[in-house]
Curated annotation (Swiss-Prot):
This is Uncharacterized 24.9 kDa protein. It comes from the Viruses. InterPro entries: AcMNPV_AC81. It comes from Orgyia pseudotsugata multicapsid polyhedrosis virus (OpMNPV).
Length: 218
């Protein structure tokens, strides 16, 4: 018996998404059961869950909203490092948080408070392309060059640049000690601290090419 098409569709829980979208788990390099397995997610399966079966039975707005947030890392480097995540609201009524690099909790329920960095207003086609890019970034995640900031903000990670500079200066200082280098290191760390805690700007709202009419209307 087919379900009533006019009843609201129940969204899959983030736990189900994490489990069902995992297409491959890398075997641990050792027999240590505490080693972390890298999960590969299937972007097409995600889009099937989010969009398949909608549109034919009821009208909808074809407006998807993705908000990119920044929060301070609580476990390590509490006031220096920041974590970026996306709050995804689809035109079909689904809402969830996408946290790159947080496996196995990449997909989470909406519960995190943070500072909004960017807001994307997209049609279905552009939102699907953006979600595919997110999943591709998550599958190739690494802390240095493809972290949560670079995946969600489409830029070279500001944190990576500053921390990389600190590491290079420390290595240089091992060979040729200089109080000036230590001062520069402290200034860089201070800049990173200020960037993640005090430098606050208005969210940048981005419309896809198919939703520019909404921008012009505003």
């Amino acid at each position: 018996m087919n379900p009533n098409p006019f009843l609201p569709r129940k969204a899959l829980s983030p736990t189900a998404l994490n489990q069902n979208l995992a297409t491959h788990r890398r075997r641990p390099k050792s027999k240590n059961w505490t080693s972390v397995n890298k999960i590969k997610y299937d972007s097409e399966l995600l889009l099937q869950y989010l969009y398949e079966g909608f549109g034919a039975d009821r009208p909808y707005s074809d407006i998807n909203v993705i908000k990119v947030y920044k929060v301070k890392v609580k476990k390590t480097g509490a006031s220096i490092l920041a974590h970026y995540f996306a709050h995804v609201s689809t035109s079909t009524g689904y809402e969830f948080e996408f946290h790159p690099g947080s496996q196995p909790r990449t997909f989470q329920t909406v519960h995190t408070d943070g500072l909004i960095i960017k807001v994307h207003i997209m049609c279905d086609a552009c939102c699907k392309a953006e979600l595919r890019r997110y999943i591709e970034g998550e599958n190739g995640f690494n802390v240095a060059f493809r972290n949560c900031e670079s995946i969600l903000c489409r830029r070279v990670s500001f944190q990576t640049l500053l921390l990389g500079s600190v590491i290079l200066l420390l290595l240089f200082n091992v060979e040729n000690f200089s109080a000036l280098n230590l001062l520069v290191i402290l200034l860089i760390l201070l800049a990173l601290f200020c960037h993640n805690n005090y430098i606050i700007s208005n969210p940048h709202v981005v419309f896809c090419n198919h939703k520019n009419a909404l921008k012009n209307h505003e």
